[in-house]
């Protein structure tokens, strides 16, 4: 039991910098101009995106394409613009972070 608690503590400390790094990347790529983690802004909250796509096969690839190319109609009438300033690697990293949001 004691080892489990220690392991959980160590893992949470190690995971925290990754979460902060992804939030910083989202800010740097202007994602946070339209999105937030917990609240709808112009676009949906990341936790809502994670809930909608939880367990869906191909969700990661679909969302990477949406980040890069934009799209409309999934979350209402306001379209998501294409993001040419985001590399595919950064888009994939952001999508993985978004899908892990609770």
Role assignments for model-derived ranges:
Residues 1-22, 102:
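N-terminal export/targeting leaders of redox proteins
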Residues 5, 11-12, 53, 59-61, ...:
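Extracytoplasmic c-type cytochrome modules immediately beyond a signal peptide or single-pass transmembrane anchor
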Residues 20-37:
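Sequence/structural segment immediately N-terminal to covalent heme-attachment motifs in c-type
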Residues 21, 41, 58-62, 75:
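Alpha-helix N-cap and coil->helix boundary residues
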Residues 33, 42-53, 66-95:
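Axial heme c-ligation environment in periplasmic c-type cytochrome domains
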Residues 97-101:
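C-terminal alpha-helix
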């Amino acid at each position: 039991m004691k080892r489990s608690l220690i392991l959980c503590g160590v893992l949470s400390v190690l995971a925290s910098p990754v979460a902060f790094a992804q939030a910083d990347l989202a800010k740097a790529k202007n994602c946070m101009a339209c999105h937030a983690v917990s609240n709808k802004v112009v676009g949906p909250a990341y936790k809502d995106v994670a809930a909608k796509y939880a367990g869906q096969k191909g969700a990661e690839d679909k969302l990477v394409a949406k980040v890069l190319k934009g799209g409309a109609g999934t979350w209402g009438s306001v379209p998501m613009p294409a993001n040419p300033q985001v590399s595919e690697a950064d888009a994939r990293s952001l999508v993985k972070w978004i899908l892990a949001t609770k």
